[in-house]
A protein has these predicted regions:
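Bacterial N-terminal signal peptides that target proteins for export
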Residues: 1-7
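Bacterial N-terminal signal peptides
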Residues: 8-16
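Beta-rich carbohydrate-recognition modules and glycan-binding surfaces
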Residues: 19-185
Length: 185
């Protein structure tokens, strides 16, 4: 009888998991527990550009967030700064896109996704988003990501995702963006 009750309770609880709840369990970065070990900062200086900036991790109102600031310059064939991680891994099969909770100014900004098939540094899939001064959520469906850098398949294959980056890209501008959460939905 006790075993039946336990099995019934487990069955009821399993049925209570909604698709939204399952999606919430997908890979999610909240920038806690040593985020500097999972995130790297890059500029176009690796290829001769002159953009500059920094990535810091800050706490405000009980939430840790990443803060990327700097200046993007297209001089000397440059034009980007970015923060990148490979810690999210590939999304689960049912994932449909990338979700961010962010704020900032001087957008647009971009999510750059690299896959197991992006071999050259200038190859990635890109989707843009705008920012506001207040914390807000943006959802970027996988089909919004476009191949950049040549020699890539036209559509992003989500299960081949190897890294995710937030990038300030392609135009001269000051950068100020904060990310509180990033993951798949």
């Amino acid at each position: 009888m006790v075993l039946k009750s336990i099995l019934l309770a487990l069955f009821v609880l399993a049925g209570a998991v909604t698709p939204q709840a399952a999606a919430a369990e997908m890979a999610l970065e909240t920038f806690e527990n040593d985020p500097a070990s999972r995130w790297q900062f890059f500029t176009d200086g690796v290829m001769g550009g002159v953009s500059s900036g920094e990535l810091t991790f800050e706490e405000a109102a009980g939430n840790v967030h990443a803060r990327m600031t700097g200046e993007v310059s297209t001089a000397n064939n440059g034009g980007f700064i970015q923060m990148r991680t490979d810690a999210l891994g590939a999304p689960r099969v049912e994932a449909t896109g990338v979700r961010l909770v962010m704020r900032g100014s001087n957008g647009p900004y971009y999510v750059h996704v690299r896959t197991s098939n992006t071999r050259l540094p200038w190859q990635f899939y890109q989707a843009g988003f705008n920012v506001t001064p207040a914390w807000s959520e943006v959802r970027l469906p996988f089909d919004a990501f476009k191949a950049r850098g040549g020699l890539l398949r036209a559509g992003l294959k989500p299960q081949s995702i190897a890294s995710v980056a937030i990038a300030a890209y392609g135009r001269d501008h000051g950068v100020e963006i904060e990310i509180r959460e990033i993951g798949f939905y």
